[in-house]
Design a protein with these regions (language model features):
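Hydrophobic transmembrane alpha-helices and their immediate loop junctions
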Residues: 1-192
Length: 192
């Protein structure tokens, strides 16, 4: 892990980020890679802008193969409403970019990846925005256990479907399988 401080916030880049990048560079074209990183930067900028607007402050940023996690300082975005705004801001930035670029006739890789990133980040995995939103409303409630059971079944279905896609479609669909397996494994590790 590489760790630096930027503006008082700890920024940690985990080994899995470098492994993920190596796989991307092996399997994809350079224009797709640049679009991918642009979409990721746009997504995280949406979160950061909302965090700033709601009075939150960053304590650390963890960058791994599963994505980026922005941790806030205590006393920042304390209300559930503000946390929800910050969590939705990343996917909203991606959807806004997709709509604006499509409106002006740009139908290339960047708008497509932007829409995919918005949908992907709303999946109910703990390391993604969708999972954080589910946790925001279910942790500590009487429904927490039932919600976790339903989500586990959903995640296993996603793994099965992505494995079938990788088998029938081939190499192009393999990243879907790898991502669904990595996200599920991350959720299991997080529970321990």
């Amino acid at each position: 892990m590489i760790s630096v401080r930027i503006g008082g916030a700890a920024v940690r880049i985990h080994f899995s980020f470098f492994v993920f990048n190596a796989l991307i560079f092996l399997m994809r074209s350079s224009s797709l890679i640049l679009s991918f990183y642009g979409v990721c930067l746009l997504h995280e900028s949406g979160h950061l802008a909302a965090l700033k607007l709601t009075g939150g402050r960053i304590s650390s940023v963890d960058i791994s193969g599963a994505g980026a996690v922005i941790n806030t300082r205590k006393g920042g975005i304390a209300t559930a409403k503000n946390r929800l705004i910050v969590l939705l801001a990343g996917p909203a930035a991606n959807i806004f970019a997709y709509l604006m670029l499509s409106l002006f006739g740009c139908h290339g890789k960047f708008p497509q990846l932007s829409l995919i990133a918005a949908v992907y980040n709303m999946l109910p995995y703990h390391s993604l925005d969708g999972g954080a939103i589910v946790s925001l409303f279910s942790v500590g409630t009487a429904y927490e256990r039932a919600v976790n059971s339903i989500l586990t079944a959903f995640k296993m279905l996603v793994i099965a479907v992505s494995a079938a896609a990788a088998y029938f479609v081939g190499r192009e669909a393999f990243p879907l399988f790898a991502a669904s397996l990595a996200l599920f494994t991350g959720d299991i590790a997080r529970r321990r």
